[in-house]
A protein has these predicted regions:
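Conserved N-terminal catalytic core of the sugar/cofactor nucleotidyltransferase
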Residues: 2-9, 13-30, 37-41, 45, ...
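Substrate-engagement module of ASCE P-loop NTPases
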Residues: 154-158
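A short, conserved acidic/glycine-rich loop-to-beta-strand motif
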Residues: 159-163
Length: 163
């Protein structure tokens, strides 16, 4: 069952059923998985790098969420492991953002399965949005350039491109 649903998500032309609305809506997906091992000893399993306030103002996760401000997009979905769901909720609340969903990975298996989980969840409502997958821990020095590029990238993806 999950395999056929995943195939449906990936095959944008021939496998789309009539119950899926064609849309160019942009659905941000923030990938906040991880084990907290790369920035040890600051980063730990219970408080990994995306949630640390390394520069004192906000965490990389919060900076990623804030980067979406001003875009025509749905509220973000966040994919994380169960141990971090409360960190995600607390950090979203601290910056005044409500997530569309906090999706829990049954087991961390890197980017592709996390994005597939988000795609399946997004399609559950009968729409087929363009997903904007964002790692929760990347630093971006020029967020205005990112915001300027997203609309064109979204249009290209809606037309079937892999951006």
């Amino acid at each position: 069952m999950a395999a056929s649903a995943l195939r449906s998500c990936l095959n944008r032309d021939s496998d789309r059923g009539p119950d899926i609305a064609h849309t160019t809506a942009l659905q941000p997906v923030i990938l906040a998985g991880g084990a907290g091992t790369r920035l040890w000893p600051l980063s730990r399993a219970d408080h990994p790098k995306p949630f640390l306030r390394l520069d004192g103002a906000q965490s990389p996760f919060q900076a990623t969420v804030r980067r979406l401000e001003g875009l025509e997009a749905a509220p973000p979905m966040v994919v994380c492991n169960a141990a971090h769901r409360f960190l995600v909720a607390e950090q979203l609340e601290a910056i005044g953002v409500t997530a569309a969903a906090i999706l829990l990975e049954p087991e961390g298996r890197n980017t592709a399965p996390a994005v597939a989980l988000a795609a399946l969840h997004a399609r559950a409502d009968g729409v087929d949005p363009v997903l904007l997958a964002l790692p929760a821990d990347h630093r971006m020095d020029h967020p205005a350039g990112f915001r300027a590029a997203v609309p064109a990238a979204g249009r290209a993806a809606a037309e079937g491109g892999l951006v």
